[in-house]
Regions:
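Non-catalytic signal-transmission and effector/linker regions of two-component phosphorelay proteins
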Residues: 1-3
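Conserved acidic carboxylate
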Residues: 8
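Two-component/phosphorelay signaling modules centered on CheY-like receiver
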Residues: 11-35, 74
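Residue-level signal for beta-strand positions within conserved beta-sheet cores that form or flank
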Residues: 30, 77, 129
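Acidic, metal-coordinating helix/loop segments flanking the phosphotransfer/catalytic sites
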Residues: 33-53
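CheY-like receiver
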Residues: 45, 51-126
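Conserved binding/recognition cores within well-folded domains
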Residues: 117-154
Length: 154
């Protein structure tokens, strides 16, 4: 089961995305656990590196989603980010945080499915290069590219 975060202050936009995720799950036979955050501050405070995809609104109270995405990249370089907004002027900036996609509201299912499938594929490719270990208080994902193995022969 993959964990999906929706960072969105509008209830109607959240309901639409959840419905699309459920529809995609039915069509693909995959299972998703969806967690919603009403603002970016709560999202970052509660963030755990267990999300595969983050749907991020840009225009939100307290902090805009673009600045939240920059902070997210400081703690998780592999999670797939999809911006969902009605502000097209931020599309170019999304490349700076390696966003997988940019969906304009109101979101059509066709556009959603294309971006969501791509986000899952990108995340899966990144995950193939990581291992998960148990640490005090939870789990930690480590890139296998950063691991050095020491073999001691007696």
């Amino acid at each position: 089961m993959r964990n999906i975060a929706i960072v969105e202050d509008e209830d109607s936009a959240t309901a639409l995305l959840k419905g699309y995720i459920e529809k995609y799950a039915e069509k693909s036979g995959q299972q998703f656990n969806v967690v919603r955050f009403k603002n970016g501050v709560d999202f970052l405070e509660d963030y755990q590196s267990t999300y595969s995809v983050v749907f991020m609104d840009i225009q939100m109270p307290q902090r805009n989603g673009m600045s939240v995405a920059f902070d997210l990249r400081e703690i998780d370089k592999t999670v797939s980010i999809i911006f969902v907004t009605n502000l097209s002027q931020y599309a170019q900036k999304g490349y700076e945080v390696d966003a997988v996609g940019y969906l304009m509201k109101p979101v059509s299912y066709y556009d959603f499915e294309l971006k969501f499938r791509k986000a899952l594929d990108v995340y899966a490719m990144n995950e193939e290069q990581k291992i998960t270990i148990t640490v005090a208080g939870g789990f930690c994902r480590i890139s296998t590219l950063l691991l050095f193995v020491t073999v001691i022969c007696v």
